[in-house]
Amino acid sequence: MAGRGGTGAAEYGEEGEEEEEEEAREGGAEGSPGSKLPPIVGTASELAKRKVKKKKKKKKTKGSGKGDADKHHSRGRKNQPLSSSFHDILNPHKDHGLRAEPRDKEENRQTLPYSYSINHPCFAEIEDTLSSQINESLRWDGILTDPEAEKERIRIYKLNRRKRYRLMALKCFHSDPCVEESVENLPYLSDKDCSPCSKQPSSKGDHAHSYFEASKLLHPELATTVAE
C-alpha cells in the first residue's frame, strides 16, 4: 500500500524538481519489499514520459522568455531617439536657413559696386574726363571749315601716328642707333600746324614724298607703302 501511495502521489502530485522525484522513487522502492503486493508494471515507461514532458515544458518556458526579450528589445528600439540624419530630413528648414546666408552675402557683394558707382559724387566728373579724352584723340578741337583741309590734317596726323608706332617697334626689335636717328629725323607735324588757325596746310605731294623717304630708311621687313 505504501508503494501504491508513493506512485499515486508521484502521478497526481504537482510538478516538482527531479531530485524530489528521485527521493519519492527511493522511498517507494524501500517500502515495496516489506509489502506482499507485486510491483507495479509500467512505472519506468511512465517516468520516462514524465521526464520528456518536463523537458518540453522547460523548452517552452525558455522560448517564451526569449520572445518576451525580443519584444522588449523591439520596444526599446522604437523608444530610442532618432539620429541626426533623420532629424535633418524631418526638419529641412534649418538647412535652408544656413544656405540662405551665403546667398545673401553674394547678392550684397554684387550690388555694392553698382550702388557705389551711382552714389559716387565724382561720377559726373569721370564722365567729363572720359569725353574730353575722346575729343582729344586727334590732338585738336573743332573741325575746319574747308573739308579738303580737314582731310589733309587727318592724313598728316595718321602719318605722324604711324611714325610713332614704327619707332616704338624698332626700339623693341632692334637696338641699332642709326635706325633710330634716321627715324627721328623724319618730318613731324606739330600740333600748332594742325590747329584750326593754320592758314595754309602743306601740299599733298610734299607729305607723300617725305613719307616714302621715311619708308625707305626703315627696316625692309617693316617698310610698307601707302596708296592714297
UniProtKB/Swiss-Prot annotation:
Keyword Cytoplasm: yes
Region (Disordered): 1-108
Gene Ontology molecular-function annotations: molecular condensate scaffold activity
Location(s) in or outside the cell: Nucleus, Nucleolus; Cytoplasm
Ranges of compositional bias, category Acidic residues: 12-24
Alphabetical UniProt keywords: Cytoplasm, Nucleus
Region feature (Lysine-rich domain): 49-71
Region ranges (Interaction with ATE1): 113-165
Tissue specificity comment: Highly expressed in spleen, thymus, liver and brown adipose tissue. Moderately expressed in liver, testis and lung.
Protein name: Protein LIAT1
Species: Mus musculus (Mouse)
Gene name as annotated: Liat1
